[in-house]
C-alpha cells in the first residue's frame, strides 16, 4: 500500500483501488495530488497478482487463469474492507472507497459489504462482471482458443465463462449502509462497461447519485480526473459528522 497525507492533519481518507492491469502507484499518485490539496489523505492498494505481488511465473499484469482472476477480486474486496476498518480505528472519521473500472467494481463490493457508513465512488463500473468479460471490449483479452480447446467450442467456452461470472453481481448484496453517500460515474461512450449495468447498479443503490460523462473509458481515465475528484469530494461531504 501507499499512504499519502496532506500537510495538515486530517480525519478523511480516500482508498484508491487499481484499475485492470494497473501496477504500481504512479497513476494513482498523480490522481491523488488534488485530493491531498483538498485536505484528504489517500491510500492506494497494490492488487494481489499485480506488481510486487505477482506470483512466480506470471509475466506482466496478465492473469494466467480464471481462478487467478477470482482470487484477485476476492482478495481486493476483503483487503479494502480491512483497510476501511483499520482507517476507522486509526481515527479517520470519513472514508471513501473508490476506483476506476475494475477498481470501481471492487470498491462497490467493498462498500456494500462494509458494516458501517463509508462514502463510495465507483467510476466507470457497473453492476455485473459477466458482460464486461463476455460481450464488451475486455473480452478480447481472454484466451478463448485455450478455453475452447478445453470445452469443445468457443460458444461453449463463452457460455461456461458467463455462467461462472453470473454470481459476480453487486445487486446480490444489500446497498451500502448509507447509499446517499455514494456517487456513481457512468460513461456514455464506454466500450468496456455497458450503460445498462451502470443503470442497474444505480437502481439497486437507492439514494445514490449517478453522474454521466460523455466520453470513452480510456479518455475518462486520462482526461477527466477533475470530474472524478469532485465526485469523491462530494460523496465524502454526504457522510455524517
Predicted features by range, described:
Residues 98-107:
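Gly/Ala-rich beta-loop-alpha elbow adjacent to hydrolase catalytic centers
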Residues 109-157, 212:
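Hydrolase active-site cap/lid region
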Residues 15-74:
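Cap/lid segment of the alpha/beta-hydrolase catalytic domain
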Residues 75-93:
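Conserved acidic catalytic loop of the alpha/beta-hydrolase fold
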Residues 30, 109-113, 200:
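Active-site signature of alpha/beta-hydrolase-fold catalytic machinery across serine-
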Residues 155-240:
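Serine-hydrolase catalytic core
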Residues 5-13:
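Proline/glycine-enriched tight loop/beta-turn segments at coil->beta junctions
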Amino acid at each position: 500500500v501507499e499512504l499519502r497525507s496532506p500537510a495538515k492533519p486530517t480525519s478523511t481518507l480516500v482508498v484508491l483501488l487499481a484499475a485492470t492491469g494497473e501496477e504500481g502507484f504512479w497513476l494513482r499518485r498523480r490522481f491523488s495530488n488534488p485530493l491531498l490539496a483538498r485536505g484528504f489523505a489517500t491510500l492506494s492498494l497494490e492488487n494481489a497478482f499485480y506488481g510486487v505481488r505477482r506470483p512466480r511465473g506470471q509475466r506482466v499484469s496478465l492473469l494466467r487463469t480464471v481462478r487467478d482472476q477470482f482470487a484477485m477480486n476476492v482478495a481486493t474486496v476483503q483487503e479494502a474492507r480491512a483497510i476501511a476498518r483499520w482507517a476507522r480505528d486509526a481515527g479517520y472519521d470519513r472514508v471513501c472507497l473508490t476506483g476506476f473500472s475494475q477498481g470501481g467494481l471492487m470498491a462497490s463490493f467493498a462498500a456494500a459489504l462494509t458494516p458501517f457508513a463509508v462514502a463510495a465512488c465507483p467510476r466507470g463500473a457497473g453492476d455485473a462482471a459477466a458482460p464486461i468479460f463476455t460481450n464488451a471490449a475486455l473480452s478480447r483479452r481472454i484466451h478463448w482458443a485455450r478455453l475452447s480447446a478445453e470445452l469443445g467450442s468457443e460458444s461453449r467456452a463463452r457460455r461456461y465463462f458467463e455462467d461462472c461470472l453470473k454470481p459476480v453481481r453487486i445487486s446480490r448484496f444489500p446497498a451500502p449502509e448509507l447509499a446517499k453517500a455514494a456517487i456513481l460515474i457512468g460513461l456514455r461512450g464506454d466500450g468496456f462497461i455497458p450503460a445498462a449495468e451502470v443503470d442497474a447498479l444505480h437502481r439497486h443503490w437507492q439514494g445514490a447519485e449517478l453522474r454521466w460523462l460523455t466520453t470513452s473509458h480510456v479518455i475518462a481515465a486520462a482526461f477527466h480526473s477533475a470530474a472524478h475528484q469532485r465526485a469523491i469530494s462530494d460523496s465524502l461531504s454526504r457522510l455524517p459528522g
